[in-house]
Amino acid sequence: MAKKVTGYLKLQVPAGAANPSPPIGPALGQRGLNIMEFCKAFNAQTQKEEKNTPIPVIITIYADRSFTFEMKTPPMSYFLKQAAKIQSGSKAPGRDKAGKVTKAQVREIAEKKMKDLNCDTIESAMKMVEGSARSMGLEVAG
């Protein structure tokens, strides 16, 4: 028989930097999970990632206080900021441009994010990336 799921927990944790301090410790501790077990497992799985890359993780919590976790790809805004070489998006996205990304960069980001996006083709994934870029105040060139 399968374990009974009691809940899910969504966190965004820097790659290789999971530790028991807030926000991870309190979030897991409230649910009675072993904080260090999660931190060690997460850090082991994110060793290949660039340090401090934000990794969305969905933790499935079971009735016997065990857990499993699934890691997603980093947020689209993270990839867009890296591609445009900026620290943050525009404060007024419709008027001010914060930077520029090319179609080639958009395609590369779409290919990285494809497994997490709700689409079938690379073209539709590119449209999602372009929309995110525009909402951050980035200009899509070429």
UniProtKB/Swiss-Prot annotation:
SUPFAM superfamilies in the record: Ribosomal L11/L12e N-terminal domain, Ribosomal protein L11, C-terminal domain
UniProt GO BP: translation
Posttranslational modification: One or more lysine residues are methylated.
GO molecular function: large ribosomal subunit rRNA binding; structural constituent of ribosome
InterPro entries in the cross-refs: Ribosomal_uL11, Ribosomal_uL11_bac-typ, Ribosomal_uL11_C, Ribosomal_uL11_C_sf, Ribosomal_uL11_CS, Ribosomal_uL11_N, Ribosomal_uL11_N_sf
Alphabetical UniProt keywords: Methylation, Ribonucleoprotein, Ribosomal protein, RNA-binding, rRNA-binding
Pfam families (UniProt xref): Ribosomal_L11, Ribosomal_L11_N
Disulfide bonds: none
Domain of life: Bacteria
Keyword Repressor included in the entry's annotation: no
GO-annotated cellular components: cytosolic large ribosomal subunit
Subunit annotation: Part of the ribosomal stalk of the 50S ribosomal subunit. Interacts with L10 and the large rRNA to form the base of the stalk. L10 forms an elongated spine to which L12 dimers bind in a sequential fashion forming a multimeric L10(L12)X complex.
Biological role stated in the UniProt entry: Forms part of the ribosomal stalk which helps the ribosome interact with GTP-bound translation factors.
Family the entry assigns: Belongs to the universal ribosomal protein uL11 family.
Protein name as catalogued: Large ribosomal subunit protein uL11
Gene name per UniProt: rplK
